[in-house]
Amino acid sequence: DFDVTDGAAGREWVTAEKPDAIIHLAAYTDLLKAETEPAKCIDVNAMGTLNMVRAALAIGAKLMLMSSSEVFGAAPDVIHGTRDKTCAANVYGLSKVQAEEAVRALMTRSFIVRTGCLFSAAPKGEICGILASAQDHQKLTISDDLMACPTYTLDLARAMVSLIQTEKFGIYHLINEGECNLATLAMATLGMVGSRCRVQPVSGYRGSVGIHHPSSVRLQSDAEPHLPRWEDALNRCLDEIRSEIR
């Protein structure tokens, strides 16, 4: 492990390991905290990416940057394609825009992967959190005013690994097909496990966490690889959770 904000450490690592390709996942991801310490967020996400770009160039490796739907300061009901102009709505989004700019300016053998609203079988993740809350409550109150494209981390990882083995460089939106709000995601989760807990949709996501957040973070997948429907992905995620419990 090394600190991506330390350019010398990054160059030392890639020089020693000599990878053919680098998937750059290290990031500052706390949207709320980023508003109170913007310099740190930008240092990790923007400068850290610049350091990894320079390290990749030093050994001739191709690089894949994990970016985010937060690069768009979207108006309601806008679905963003890969060619749309970025316009960050918060500090985290700005840091990712700057990271993308560093990659595009200096590298031709690169991939920029945007995604968002990730879910997984992780014990502290969104899905396990919904299931745990449903065990303790008869009703959950969850926001219905943020539209997104829920994406299973396992599907995302497989697509990224497949993509980086190619020479099809460019910007990609890797998301599970379909869209929903957070309340619908929770309803689907509880329905698939047969829970009697009810979900009460409520408005109020925007502004409730102290940051400017777009009302729509939907992305359009313009090119392969295309990921399965989010409902199918959620069902497989729940299967993974069940298998880990046994």
Where are these regions (language model features)?
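NAD(P)-dependent short-chain dehydrogenase/reductase
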Residues: E101-A148, L154-D155, V161
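NAD(P)H-binding glycine-rich loop region in Rossmannoid oxidoreductase-like domains
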Residues: V4-V44
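Conserved Rossmann-fold NAD(P)-dependent oxidoreductase catalytic core, especially the SDR/UDP-sugar
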Residues: L50-A89
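SDR active-site strand-loop-helix element
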Residues: I22-A26, L63-S69, V113-T115
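Glycine-rich NAD(P)-binding loop of the Rossmann-fold in SDR/ketoreductase-type enzymes
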Residues: T5, T36, K40-N51, T86, ...
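C-terminal amphipathic/interface module of NAD(P)-dependent oxidoreductases
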Residues: C197, H212-R246
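Active-site Tyr-X1-5-Lys
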Residues: A74, C87-F111
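Mid/C-terminal beta-alpha module of Rossmann-like enzyme folds, strongest
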Residues: D136, A159, T166-G210, L238-D239, ...
